[in-house]
From Swiss-Prot:
Top-level EC class: transferase
Protein name in UniProt: Biosynthetic peptidoglycan transglycosylase
Biological pathway: Cell wall biogenesis; peptidoglycan biosynthesis
Signal peptide: none
Originating gene: mtgA
Amino acid sequence: MKRAIRAAILTVLVLLAAPYVLTLLYGAGQPVSTLMIWRWLTGATVTREWVDIERISPALPRTVVASEDAKFCSHRGIDWDSVRDVIDDMQDGEATRGGSTITQQVAKNLFLWPGRSMVRKALEFPLALWIDLVLSKQRVLELYLNIAEWGPDGQFGAEAGAQYAFGRSAGQLTAQEAALMASILPNPRTRSARKPGRGVRRLAATYVARARSAELQQCWRENSALSGN
């Protein structure tokens, strides 16, 4: 009995430590998400072609940051202001807004499971801090752009999403097309960049404007992959 308990504890510790070790290895390579793995295991279609961030139109990372995580360049993995806003909303009984940073979404997509739960958030927070510590901002964004789901039929990553929506590579996206792709996150099965409705088009226009803000312009200057230099 004691041996079984020790084995169970050891297994849990290994599972908890594995993401931290794998993060060190993910400074290079082309990792896949847990959702992609699950889809493969269930026989669902998965389409993904990895594209280095230098080969992606700068308009896409710019509008993704503008839409998903405006403080991406300045926070250390977690946007504590957004966390406090979510807590305030919960205390006031209001519907909570999404407060996850791009780094947190990378942690979730690479190592955890979809859906909302306190357990997942408890695992996600330290992972996001670790990812930000050991990987560059450019690499974090590159991972995100290549593992996010971007289409209704198993299109993962910017390349598959761009090909599905516009019939062109991620490197050829215009600012408007990039904004439409950013606007369907994180719900590519209910929103469409290929046939955008009024709401998606309105979001896209908002994100194009946000990407031109002074704060994000500073972010682009500090990160060559975003500035197109």
